[in-house]
């Protein structure tokens, strides 16, 4: 069989891949000269001219298209390509079967060599004359190929296509009507795109309405893509293309604006959004002289969306449209701008006379949008509004009226702030003329207005910050007055509850620090220092002043000033022997500044000089200085500050710091100086900051040995032990070599199997869990971790089972130290590994354990589950439900309360996501939940959570399963309604309502 016959056979059976392979082989023969083009065309004749079968004719053309598409460049000569082009176009005159394949063949031919102008014009003419309208072809794939071809012609042969239009006045009418009725989104995406070429580049004035109508017929787009749409075309894609068409030519304005504004009255919010976005595109792209004809009409329509807000985003879009209009006219001429702004200013002034109202608030938003658009608009709005606004303000004694006017003024100032930020050096003289009046009014409001007038004072505070933020608006004297007013507010206003505006005042002062940092340094910082004496009277810590001062560090312009003053004050305080609480407060302020402030950065990394300037001196004062007055809290805070600065630094800088500190940090020196215990909090954060490659292996072993001694010491404080164990987990996770892990642990005295051998102490058990936690999260020592986990599980059957069980919750408990930010090794499979090994062992042991052993296993199980995601537990819920129910029977001790809380959280998730699994346990679950609501054996947290779970039961489980328990549940919930805790009583009310809703046969409960 010939290639064409094979192709037709495969095409008929819809085996597209095999058919294309046959065409590719034909193309290869053409390339190798074993087949001549004339022979190829001749072989097509009996099939391409088959009068009885249109499918064969179409597939024959498709074969030719696939062959041409598979040909490399330079195989066909110019003459051969021209002959093929004529052959394909000639077919269209008498037979349009396979029109899509014809289009594909022509696209492939064009890819082999660019056409000349006559050829390109002839191709377009042939399709417009012989396939008009395109919608006559029912298959989208055929229309799509034609659309792609014409898009290619319009994009690559712009001059040739424009010449067709210029030479034939009837061409455009046919071109426009060619696309009528197309509905497929893939085709429309290309059609909207190709139509923009004549819309923007050709003279289409005579055809503007037809061209506009051809696309506006699709407005608004209501297309919703089907699920799993392989083409990825969204409704927004179509909207964007259509919007570009509507805004493509100013000649469309007489048709676009009336029709868009008519659709703005639609009750559909989506239609309104599309209209407003289309209006914005038109305003942006149409010529200013054209838009000028419609400016007042547009204002009348847009103001409705702002003055009568239906949806907030619609109001924002309308405001954006008004701003675009103002910006357009600002650079076109004074006449159009005046004509546009005059009615707006008049109406806004009228609304301000009635302030405060929703309309006056909307007027303020309108003024903000106009002022922020351009300097020219800002100047005219200010001159038209501000005289009236301040006349109204000064003529009124009503604080409410003044507040509304001040809020409108703030909108104008905010507009200037935005505009000057986008256009540096913009003129603000119109606003400057009223700056003194505004400043005086705001200062007077903050100082003299009744404290209960919170909104009035807040408006004044906001206004002061905005006045300062507008470049060049205020004189130095005025800036100082504004800064002093806000500073005094922060420092001296002591009002609590309603009327307290210190927090926003601190934010306002931070804002001023951004815009006028020198004024804040010169005025505010000294004022804060006055309120921070070296030795406070009566040892009263000025905590509110410190909190406010530390928050100023959020602004990078004065960060260095804030932390330097805090450091110097801390030194003075220590020198004067002030209270430990005061020193702590200053340290916490520095920590806050470095944590939440804006320190200087080099290449995105916090500046390394901060370590030498701040962390190092603090370390010398609070960590290296060993005395009876050493404060573990201060040591901890200094460690945190050092961690923040060191953590992102390079290996080189960290190595320099580490080797400098290595001598005094070494365990031997620490023991000699007596610093071993009190430096541990610092060591924890110091080593957390270090990259793994910085610390030497020998140092790791010696440090682990020292921590082993501390961890196993029965005399150490509980907090010191916790810190030591966290450090052990960190050292094991990050610095110990996984290849020599067991040897390292054995040398340090931390081998878990040895630690737990022969009735281990509580301290040894805790150390074993700390080591295992570091290994588990690391995930690099799999077999060793498995052995250690099994060793810990075996301890649950020993004499120290209670202590062991309580420690299982630590294995996956979150720890800020063990994080990727601290360069730790974090395995994504640690939770899964622990679950797979521990949970089956524990559930099996619970089934066979004696009553005395069971509480330990239940505590261990819930301790592990507490920190596992529900998605990990869900597949094993059937296995876990019985032991979790037994957990709810535990006694009232503190560990048991934690176990109960963990079980209840899991039941809550199960009821919400996997309720059918719990159906068979309905009776046991309800009984135990009711028992957990009693006050005698359960804490308030457990009681509240049990009630939350109980409330889910009638909603999530089958009605017939829970109705029998309704009467008993409602009766026992009466006691919960008298619970001593309000939170529990609230949950009891909600739970009882849920159960009463079951409506058991119309019976009513008392």
Language-model-detected regions and their locations in the chain:
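Phosphate/NTP-binding elements of NTP-utilizing enzymes
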Residues: 864
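Structural marker for long, regular alpha helices in very large eukaryotic proteins
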Residues: 2-52, 56-841, 849, 853-860, ...
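An aromatic- and glycine-enriched ligand-binding surface/loop that stacks and positions planar moieties
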Residues: 895
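Charged/polar low-complexity intrinsically disordered segments, enriched in acidic residues
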Residues: 954-955
């Amino acid at each position: 069989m010939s290639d064409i016959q094979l192709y037709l056979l495969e095409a008929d059976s819809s085996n597209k891949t095999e058919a294309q392979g046959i065409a590719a082989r034909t193309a290869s023969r053409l390339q190798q000269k074993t087949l001549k083009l004339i022979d190829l065309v001749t072989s097509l004749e009996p099939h391409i001219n088959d009068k009885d079968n249109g499918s064969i004719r179409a597939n024959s053309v498709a074969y030719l298209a696939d062959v041409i598409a598979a040909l490399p460049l330079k195989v066909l000569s110019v003459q051969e390509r021209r002959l093929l082009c004529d052959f394909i176009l000639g077919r269209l005159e008498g037979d349009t079967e396979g029109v899509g394949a014809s289009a594909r063949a022509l696209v492939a031919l064009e890819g082999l060599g660019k056409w000349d102008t006559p050829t390109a014009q002839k191709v377009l003419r042939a399709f417009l004359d012989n396939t008009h309208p395109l919608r006559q072809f029912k298959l989208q794939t055929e229309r799509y190929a034609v659309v792609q071809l014409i898009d290619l012609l319009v994009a690559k042969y712009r001059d040739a296509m424009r010449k067709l239009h210029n030479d034939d006045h009837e061409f455009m009418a046919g071109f426009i009507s060619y696309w009528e009725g197309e509905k497929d989104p893939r085709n429309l995406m290309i059609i909207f795109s190709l139509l923009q070429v004549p819309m923007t580049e050709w003279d289409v004035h005579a055809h503007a309405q037809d061209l506009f109508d051809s696309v506006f017929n699709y407005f608004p787009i209501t297309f919703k893509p089907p699920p799993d749409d392989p083409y990825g075309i969204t409704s927004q894609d179509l909207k964007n293309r259509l919007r570009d068409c509507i805004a493509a030519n100013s000649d469309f304005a007489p048709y676009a604006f009336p029709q868009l504004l008519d659709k703005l009255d639609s009750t559909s919010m989506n239609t309104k959004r599309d209209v407003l976005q289309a209006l914005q595109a038109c305003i942006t792209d149409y010529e200013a002289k054209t838009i000028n004809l419609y400016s007042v009409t547009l204002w009348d329509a847009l103001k409705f969306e702002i003055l009568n807000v239906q949806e907030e985003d619609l109001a924002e879009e309308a405001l954006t449209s008004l701003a675009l209009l103002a910006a357009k006219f600002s650079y076109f001429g004074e006449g159009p701008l005046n004509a546009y702004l005059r009615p707006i200013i008049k109406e806004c002034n009228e609304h301000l006379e009635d302030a405060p109202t929703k309309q006056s608030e909307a007027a303020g938003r309108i003024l903000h949008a106009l002022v922020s658009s351009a300097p020219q608009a800002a100047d005219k709005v200010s001159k038209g509004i501000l005289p009236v606004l301040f006349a109204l303000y000064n003529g009124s004694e009503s604080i409410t009226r003044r507040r509304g006017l001040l809020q409108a003024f703030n909108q104008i100032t905010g507009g200037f702030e935005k505009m000057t930020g986008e256009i540096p050096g913009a003129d603000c003289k119109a606003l400057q003329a009223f700056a003194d009046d505004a400043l005086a009014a705001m200062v007077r409001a903050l100082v003299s207005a009744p404290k209960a007038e919170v909104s009035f004072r807040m408006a004044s505070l906001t206004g002061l910050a905005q006045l300062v933020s507008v470049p060049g608006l205020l004189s130095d004297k005025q800036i100082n007055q504004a800064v002093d007013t806000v500073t005094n507010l922060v420092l001296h206003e002591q009002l609590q509850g309603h009327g307290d505006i210190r927090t926003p005042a601190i934010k306002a002062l931070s804002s001023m620090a951004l815009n006028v940092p020198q004024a804040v340094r010169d005025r505010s910082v000294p004022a804060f220092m006055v309120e921070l004496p070296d030795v406070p009277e009566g040892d009263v810590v000025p905590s509110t002043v410190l909190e406010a001062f530390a928050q100023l560090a959020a602004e990078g312009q004065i960060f260095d000033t804030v932390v330097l003053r805090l450091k110097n004050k801390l030194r003075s305080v220590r020198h004067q022997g002030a209270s430990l609480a005061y020193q702590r407060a200053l340290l916490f302020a520095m920590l806050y500044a470095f944590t939440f402030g804006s320190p200087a950065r080099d290449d995105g990394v916090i500046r390394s000089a901060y370590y030498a300037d701040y962390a190092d001196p603090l370390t010398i004062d609070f960590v290296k200085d060993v005395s009876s007055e050493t404060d573990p809290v201060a040591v901890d805070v200094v460690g945190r500050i050092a961690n923040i600065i060191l953590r992102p630094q390079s290996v080189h800088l960290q190595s320099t710091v580490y080797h400098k500190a290595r001598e005094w940090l070494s365990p031997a020196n620490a023991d000699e100086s007596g610093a071993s215990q009190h430096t541990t909090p610092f060591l924890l954060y110091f080593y957390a900051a270090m990259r793994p490659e910085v610390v030497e292996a020998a140092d790791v072993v010696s440090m682990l040995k020292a921590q082993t001694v501390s961890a196993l010491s029965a005399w150490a404080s509980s907090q010191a032990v916790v810190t030591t164990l966290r450090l052990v987990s960190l050292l094991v996770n990050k610095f110990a070599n996984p290849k020599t892990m067991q040897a390292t642990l054995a040398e340090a005295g931390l081998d878990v199997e040895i630690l737990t051998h022969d009735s281990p102490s509580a301290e040894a058990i805790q150390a074993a869990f700390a080591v295992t936690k570091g290994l588990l999260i690391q995930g690099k020592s799999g077999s060793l971790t498995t052995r250690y986990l099994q060793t810990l599980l075996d301890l649950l059957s020993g004499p120290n089972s209670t202590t062991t069980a309580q420690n299982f919750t630590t294995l996956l408990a979150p720890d800020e130290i063990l994080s990727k930010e601290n360069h730790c090794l974090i395995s994504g499979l640690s939770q899964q590994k622990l679950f797979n090994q521990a949970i089956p062992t524990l559930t099996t042991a619970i089934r066979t354990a004696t009553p005395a052993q069971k509480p330990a296993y239940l505590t261990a199980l819930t301790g592990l589950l507490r920190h596992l995601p529900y998605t990990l537990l869900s597949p094993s819920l059937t296995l876990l439900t019985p032991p979790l129910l037994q957990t709810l029977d535990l006694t009232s001790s503190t560990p048991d309360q934690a176990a109960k809380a963990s079980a209840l959280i899991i039941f809550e998730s199960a009821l919400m996501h996997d309720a059918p699994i719990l159906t068979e346990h309905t009776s046991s679950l309800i009984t135990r939940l009711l028992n957990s609501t009693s006050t005698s054996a359960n804490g308030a947290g457990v009681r509240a959570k049990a009630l939350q779970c109980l409330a889910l039961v009638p909603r999530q489980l089958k009605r017939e399963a829970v109705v029998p328990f309704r009467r008993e549940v409602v009766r026992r919930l009466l006691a919960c309604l008298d619970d001593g805790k309000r939170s529990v009583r609230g949950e009891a009310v909600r739970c009882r309502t849920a159960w009463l809703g079951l409506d058991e046969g119309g019976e009513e409960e008392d």
